[in-house]
């Protein structure tokens, strides 16, 4: 595939790595020191973006956005933010929404509480990749 497919594959692989080694991943995202494995991840993203035709600044910016997306999404999964609500959590949400101050949120409660992490991850990644395609067209 093209550069978009290569970046998508890297993002999916990074997310999968987080699930295979959650303890190490959580340490990785909170540690400020550079490690060889971290540099390898950056190198892979930089390489694809550079070959795609992004200039230096956009290569770095795009890589940071993609990595931040994967890190934040995987963090949410590993800390139980990206999962369907339990019956108790749904009941608590319904109670908070009962006073009518948040009608749009209330109308979306069924969707909000029955998330599918894989679908949401692909959705966000597709948006980022579409934005990068647009940005590359401006270069």
Identify the residue ranges that each predicted region occupies.
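A general structural signal for well-ordered secondary-structure junctions
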Residues: 24, 55, 72, 102-103
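Short alpha-helical functional segments enriched in proximate histidine and acidic residues
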Residues: 17, 48, 69, 131, ...
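A contiguous pocket-lining binding segment that forms or flanks enzyme active sites
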Residues: 42-79, 87-91
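C-terminal peripheral helix-coil segments that are non-catalytic and often amphipathic
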Residues: 51-54, 79-139
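Hydrophobic alpha-helical connector segments
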Residues: 1-39, 56-59, 63-66
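Short amphipathic alpha-helical interaction/hinge segments
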Residues: 22, 26, 74-81, 136
């Amino acid at each position: 595939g093209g550069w978009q497919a290569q970046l998508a594959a890297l993002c999916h692989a990074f997310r999968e790595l987080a699930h295979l080694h959650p303890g190490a991943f959580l340490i990785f995202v909170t540690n400020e020191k550079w490690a060889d494995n971290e540099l390898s991840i950056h190198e892979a993203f930089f390489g694809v973006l550079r070959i795609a035709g992004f200039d230096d600044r956009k290569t770095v910016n795009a890589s940071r956005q993609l990595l931040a997306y994967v890190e934040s999404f995987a963090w949410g999964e590993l800390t139980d933010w990206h999962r369907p609500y339990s019956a108790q959590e749904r009941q608590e949400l319904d109670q908070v929404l009962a006073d009518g101050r948040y009608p749009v949120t209330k109308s979306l409660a069924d969707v909000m509480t029955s998330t599918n992490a894989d679908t949401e991850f692909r959705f966000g990644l597709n948006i980022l990749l579409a934005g990068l395609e647009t940005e590359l067209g401006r270069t």
